[in-house]
């Protein structure tokens, strides 16, 4: 862990997470705000939901392609937690990424607050439960929405696979859009604790905010359980996991497997 913190590449990755998260939150939440919002007569709620969902999904796809080679483009604490539990990053990297993501979200939301300051009752995209939705229902929506996202991330970035084609960032972006199409009418769609945190901080309103941390973290952890232990099991033991968690990310390890159906041994180089 001490050796990783001394590397320039590590800090470049942290900065990349901060910058990409700032752009992501500005673009995505900005799409839900504006001087014609709430909806005008010539718009429908469905049209607006699709617009916002596409903005979230396409911005993730674009930024994942832009900084994925630098940081992995997590841009979501739930994704970071999932990759940590999947033994693909160190504990130090996970902590620094989540801090960078939260700070980036706050900065982006603060900029949006200044730009849209004349809007009446500006929520800055703050997540909350829709009318008639209770906390248990909202939590369930956040769990399912995040589970399918982290499952997509794990599957499309699995280096053991030989059948992958097309663009992983695009697939992940579509997964984000899909999550929003599901959840936006129930919770405003969090599935990203940092994005929810930025809006809560700037509006000083943390009502039901716990849902948008607990739900995504449970969903991310369940995705790892399903993928790494049921669908595509890995045979690394606790010692191997500790080496990744303390010494560095998965690029420093060999994953030996002939195909996706084989069990994998994680061996340090």
Swiss-Prot record:
The modification Phosphoserine is found at residues 247, 262. GO terms for molecular function: ammonium channel activity; carbon dioxide transmembrane transporter activity; ephrin receptor binding; glycerol transmembrane transporter activity; hydrogen peroxide channel activity; identical protein binding; intracellularly cGMP-activated cation channel activity; nitric oxide transmembrane transporter activity. The modification Phosphotyrosine is found at residue 253. GO terms for cellular component: ankyrin-1 complex; apical plasma membrane; axon; axon terminus; basal plasma membrane; basolateral plasma membrane; brush border; brush border membrane. A motif (NPA 2) lies at residues 192-194. It comes from the Eukaryota. PANTHER family: AQUAPORIN TRANSPORTER, AQUAPORIN-1. Forms a water channel that facilitates the transport of water across cell membranes, playing a crucial role in water homeostasis in various tissues. Could also be permeable to small solutes including hydrogen peroxide, glycerol and gases such as amonnia (NH3), nitric oxide (NO) and carbon dioxide (CO2). Recruited to the ankyrin-1 complex, a multiprotein complex of the erythrocyte membrane, it could be part of a CO2 metabolon, linking facilitated diffusion of CO2 across the membrane, anion exchange of Cl(-)/HCO3(-) and interconversion of dissolved CO2 and carbonic acid in the cytosol. Belongs to the MIP/aquaporin (TC 1.A.8) family. This is Aquaporin-1. It comes from Mus musculus (Mouse). The lineage of its organism: Eukaryota, Metazoa, Chordata, Craniata, Vertebrata. The gene is Aqp1.
């Amino acid at each position: 862990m001490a050796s990783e913190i001394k590397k320039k590449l590590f800090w470049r990755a942290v900065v990349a997470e901060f910058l990409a998260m700032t752009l992501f939150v500005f673009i995505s939440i900005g799409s839900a705000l504006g001087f014609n919002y709430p909806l005008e007569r010539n718009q429908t709620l469905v049209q607006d939901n699709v617009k916002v969902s596409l903005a979230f999904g396409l911005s993730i796809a674009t930024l994942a392609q832009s900084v994925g080679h630098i940081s992995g483009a997590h841009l979501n604490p739930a994704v970071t937690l999932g990759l940590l539990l999947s033994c693909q990053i160190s504990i130090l990297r996970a902590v620094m990424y989540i801090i960078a993501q939260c700070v980036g979200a706050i900065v982006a939301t603060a900029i949006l607050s200044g730009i849209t300051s004349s809007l009446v009752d500006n929520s800055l995209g703050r997540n909350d439960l829709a009318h008639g939705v209770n906390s248990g229902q909202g939590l369930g929506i956040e769990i399912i929405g995040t589970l399918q996202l982290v499952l997509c991330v794990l599957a499309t970035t699995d280096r053991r696979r030989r059948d992958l084609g097309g663009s992983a960032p695009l697939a992940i972006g579509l997964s984000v859009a899909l999550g929003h199409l599901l959840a936006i009418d129930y919770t405003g769609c969090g599935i990203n604790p940092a994005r929810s945190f930025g809006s809560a901080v700037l509006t000083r309103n943390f009502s039901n905010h716990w849902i948008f941390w607990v739900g995504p973290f449970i969903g991310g952890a369940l995705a790892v359980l399903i993928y790494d232990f049921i669908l595509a099991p890995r045979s690394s033991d606790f010692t191997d996991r500790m080496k990744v968690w303390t010494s560095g990310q998965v690029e420093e390890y060999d994953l030996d497997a002939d195909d996706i159906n084989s069990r994998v041994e994680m061996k340090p180089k």
